[in-house]
Structure formats: structure tokens, C-alpha cells
Design a protein with these regions (language model features):
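Positively charged, low-complexity terminal tracts
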Residues: 1-84
Length: 84
């Protein structure tokens, strides 16, 4: 196993504030995957049409997405065990 490094993460004030998303779309082509994070605005639906806005797009290696999915599953399972 490779030596672990400690990352020093820096972020702009805008990125630190975060962005709200209530939906996502994942697509994979070859070695890369894309996650589109959306805000679906149900309050302004007109008939069958519901407006949705892309709030962020993340493109990453598919291998990293697989690692992320495993990490998310572990994290959510632990969270649910604690009773949310």
C-alpha cells in the first residue's frame, strides 16, 4: 500500500458556502464518470413540467467514483445505525 499523504484542502468562500442539490444524474463513458447535481424546483412546476437547474457538474475517473460509492455506503450505514 502506498504511503498516505495528508491533504491541505483550500477553498474559495463561495465553495465553502456549498450548493444545495436535491437530485443527481450519473453517467459513465469509458474511464470517466460525470455526476450532475441538480436543483429540482417543484414549487414552480407547471403541469407535467418541473424546472430543474444544474448547480454543479463533477467529472472524475470511474475508479474514483467506485471508491466514493463504497465510502458513501459505509458512511450512510454507520449513520443509520446511530439512528440518524
Amino acid at each position: 500500500m502506498a504511503d498516505e499523504v495528508q491533504l491541505r484542502v483550500e477553498a474559495s468562500p463561495e465553495n465553502l458556502a456549498g450548493t444545495y442539490s436535491n437530485a443527481s444524474i450519473v453517467s459513465t463513458t469509458g474511464a470517466e464518470s460525470r455526476i450532475d447535481f441538480l436543483y429540482v424546483d417543484h414549487a414552480n412546476a407547471q403541469g407535467d413540467e418541473v424546472p430543474a437547474y444544474l448547480v454543479s457538474r463533477v467529472i472524475m475517473p470511474t475508479t474514483e467514483l467506485a471508491h466514493m460509492a463504497e465510502t458513501l455506503n459505509d458512511h450512510i450505514a454507520k449513520h443509520l445505525e446511530q439512528g440518524m
